[in-house]
């Protein structure tokens, strides 16, 4: 498994996004040791993406997530910026398009969507044995992926206002032509037929614009799950990565055993996405088993029970359980951003506070020896999690 995190580049004094990605990208590549992962540019010069290499150990993945954030933060400081884990900018910004013909075509073709859509997500890749297995996985995880939106929710503010959503990034992202959930495919052949048909419409520039909630990667032998905000805390990134791997493993085992997938309509999954984006973990989510609204803690507990055998098999159960307990105890990035705004009344300060979470997490790692290690729990930045999941979630 591996992850891609998109980070917002903000001014160190004001918290306003700044177009310094070209310099940060060059500096990060020059600083990089061999075989680290990757640092790449995005469509707007106010953001950058960091990727891990593939890992089998969740703890090792977490260590590289921290290392990636620390690297781009260090380089960004040289340009008067922070690399902030923010899924949208709390302050108003007019993005600057990066160099490249494809990006300029997107800016020209899709109107206000890319111009107002400075959004940062988390993408999780999990290896599969074959495309056929991958499609079977897509068909079986689609009703569970809305829970990941709620867990990662980290974008309550946009363009200087509280949007009323926990994940406004999800709402903004849904404007892209192909974004969102799909109906069941049923076979690799059907997946190919559907996606090729989407490309034939001419609404998308290329295969890279198949912005499905989850898809077969066109570059790697993986399933790529794309619904999450970039989390405020690196520990949440690790927790979500562990859950996604377990979701994929569980779905693959169901397929191999002949278990049928649920025939939940895509419109229902889309509404589940919307509910998750609205309230995060502070309200209700859609129960994938009944299609009815239920308290968020109950739905997260259902997901945990669904994938627990895979978590145990991967050795991830304790780390993920503690990560979820910590998330419920401390709140999502959205709730913590709102708490910071209630204290400061300044959205620029909210952005700057978010930028420091990666710095503090790195300091906690050095002080406590948290990553990598066998007993990492979900202590990130020196904040211990609850001792178990039952008190916080169950």
What are these regions (language model features)?
Residues 34, 38-41, 45, 97, ...:
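N-proximal short alpha-helices
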Residues 1-79, 173-394:
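C-terminal accessory/tail domains of diverse enzymes
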Residues 61-65, 130, 137:
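Residue-level preference for long, well-ordered alpha-helices that form the structural scaffold
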Residues 55, 82, 96, 104, ...:
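Histidine (H) residue identity feature
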Residues 53-120:
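Well-ordered mid-protein domain cores that form the structural environment of catalytic cofactors
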Residues 86, 90-92, 101, 105-122, ...:
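Metal-dependent DNA replication initiation modules
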């Amino acid at each position: 498994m591996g992850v891609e995190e998109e980070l917002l580049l903000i001014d160190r004094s004001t918290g306003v996004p700044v177009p310094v990605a070209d310099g940060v990208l060059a500096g990060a590549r020059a600083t990089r040791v061999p075989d680290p992962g990757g640092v790449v540019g995005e469509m707007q010069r106010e953001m950058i993406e960091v990727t891990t290499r593939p890992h089998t150990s969740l703890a090792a993945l977490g260590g590289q997530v921290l290392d990636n954030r620390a690297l781009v933060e260090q380089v960004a400081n040289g340009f008067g910026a922070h690399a902030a884990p923010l899924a949208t900018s709390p302050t108003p910004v007019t993005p600057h398009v990066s160099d490249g013909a494809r990006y300029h075509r997107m800016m020209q073709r899709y109107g206000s969507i890319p111009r107002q859509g400075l959004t940062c997500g988390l993408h999780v890749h999990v290896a599969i044995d074959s495309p056929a297995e991958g499609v079977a996985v897509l068909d079986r995880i689609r009703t569970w992926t809305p829970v990941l939106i709620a867990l990662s929710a980290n974008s309550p503010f946009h363009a200087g206002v509280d949007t009323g959503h926990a994940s406004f990034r999800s709402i903004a992202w849904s404007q892209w032509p192909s974004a969102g959930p799909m109906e069941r495919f049923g076979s690799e052949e059907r997946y190919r037929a559907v996606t090729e048909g989407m490309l034939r419409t001419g609404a998308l520039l290329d295969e890279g614009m198949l912005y499905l909630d989850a898809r077969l990667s066109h570059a790697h032998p993986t399933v790529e799950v794309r619904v999450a905000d970039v989390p405020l805390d690196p520990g949440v990134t690790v927790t979500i990565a562990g859950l996604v791997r377990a979701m994929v493993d569980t779905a693959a085992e169901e397929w191999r055993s002949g278990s049928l997938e649920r025939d939940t309509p895509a419109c229902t999954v889309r509404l589940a996405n919307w509910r998750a984006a609205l309230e995060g973990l502070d309200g209700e989510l859609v129960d994938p088993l009944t299609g009815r609204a239920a308290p968020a803690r109950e739905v997260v507990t259902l997901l945990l029970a669904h994938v627990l055998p895979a978590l145990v098999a991967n050795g991830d159960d304790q780390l993920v359980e503690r990560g979820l307990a910590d998330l419920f105890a401390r709140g999502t990035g959205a709730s913590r951003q709102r708490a910071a705004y209630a204290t400061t009344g300044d959205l620029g300060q909210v952005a700057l506070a978010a930028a420091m979470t990666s710095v503090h997490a790195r300091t906690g790692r050095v002080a406590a020896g948290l990553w990598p290690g066998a007993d990492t729990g979900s202590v990130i930045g020196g904040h211990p999690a609850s001792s178990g999941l039952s008190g916080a979630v169950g």
